[in-house]
């Protein structure tokens, strides 16, 4: 099976690599989900990995398959998977739980581990390949109506987290009273839309995750 990979630490090393075919049996306890990749987002993170700024190959490999923004269709599920069925459209998450207290309570995005595993970024192969398998816990179902934009779910989650954290920081002031405008702007994340201006909004900063079909 073909995949797009880099040699971490070597600039401009992007190349085609061969991977063994994945199967639902690769995941223990009958919880595997085999996915056909339909789209992969390519953003600044992937560029920086190819520039050798960071990135780490999985154990036993000297290359790293890139691509952390995925969208695909389920081909097969393990015997103990009930929440997802073959034919479903799905997106896979990126980071995997580690050992910190935040990982243990389901907040791996807030991990304090110095080293963590992220598909297509650090210690785990990514999704820029023909097929992949992962545990059902890391697979998010997508309505068929969103199939054309489903690959944007991962970068959108970063925007959502930024807004959520801005609200959380403000709530700690105890007397925060966000004023809502009478006329709401139609564009997502408009400055001042709900009393919060996303970071970079005034600069029209697209941020580090710029997505395109691969």
Question: Where in the sequence are the language-model features?
Answer:
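Short N-terminal strand-loop motif that marks the start
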Residues: 1-69, 130, 170
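Cofactor-binding loop segments of dinucleotide-utilizing enzymes, especially the Rossmann-like FAD-
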Residues: 8, 38-40, 183-185, 208-210
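Glycine-rich beta-strand-centered segment in the early N-terminal region that forms part
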Residues: 24-40, 54-104, 143-145
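Conserved beta-strand elements of the Class I
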Residues: 34, 179-181
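NAD(P)H dinucleotide-binding glycine-rich loop of Rossmann-like/cofactor-binding domains
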Residues: 97-179
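Hydrophobic/small residue at the entry helix of a nucleotide-binding pocket
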Residues: 158, 187-188, 212
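Adenosine-nucleotide cofactor-binding segment
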Residues: 176-179, 197-214
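Conserved SAM-binding loop of SAM-dependent methyltransferases across substrates and taxa
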Residues: 190-198
């Amino acid at each position: 099976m073909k995949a797009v990979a880099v040699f971490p630490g070597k600039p401009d090393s992007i190349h085609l690599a061969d991977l063994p075919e994945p199967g639902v049996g690769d995941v223990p306890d009958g919880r595997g989900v085999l996915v056909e990749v339909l789209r992969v987002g390519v953003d600044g993170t992937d560029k920086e990995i190819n520039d050798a700024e960071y990135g780490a190959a999985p154990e036993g490999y000297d290359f790293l398959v890139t691509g952390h923004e995925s969208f695909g269709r389920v081909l097969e599920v393990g015997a103990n998977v009930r929440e997802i069925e073959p034919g479903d459209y799905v997106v896979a998450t990126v980071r995997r739980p580690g050992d910190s207290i935040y990982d243990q309570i389901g907040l791996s995005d807030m991990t304090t581990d110095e080293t963590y595993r992220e598909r297509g970024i650090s210690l785990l192969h990514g999704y820029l390949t023909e097929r992949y398998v992962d545990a059902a816990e890391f697979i998010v179902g997508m309505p068929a109506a969103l199939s054309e934009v489903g690959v944007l779910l991962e970068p959108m989650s970063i925007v959502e987290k930024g807004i959520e954290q801005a609200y959380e920081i403000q709530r700690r002031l105890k007397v925060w009273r966000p004023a809502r405008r009478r006329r709401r702007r139609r564009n997502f994340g408009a400055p001042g839309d709900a009393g919060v201006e996303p970071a970079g909004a005034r600069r029209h900063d697209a941020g580090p995750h710029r997505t395109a079909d691969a």
